[in-house]
Amino acid sequence: MVKNIPVFKDNNSKLAIIAIHGWKGNRSSMEHVANALNIKYAQWTFIQGPYAAGDNKYSWFEGNEEEGWKYQESFDLLHKTILDINKNGFPKSKIFLLGFSQGACLAM
């Protein structure tokens, strides 16, 4: 079940960027990247991994080689986020993914 709700920032945007944090990050981890890039007319959405990896730290994947890996919640969250942004008026060709480390793996 998808538990995370994306945080939408800008209202007058021509493109949407979904920011995906790295291992042990959270939805706030990518805000400094958004501020540094300063992309005009971009709506930023900061999502958070569904798997706990410490105090206010999250992961996009959970498990190990012996027991197997969990990742379906992450795929579902990203898919739902893209659909929500699309429903809010952004064509899919104007929705971009920006990930750091483990978040970049999810973006691929």
Segments and roles (model prediction):
Residues 2-11, 15-92:
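Serine-hydrolase catalytic machinery in alpha/beta-hydrolase-like enzymes
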Residues 94-96:
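Short glycine-rich phosphate-binding loop at a beta-alpha junction
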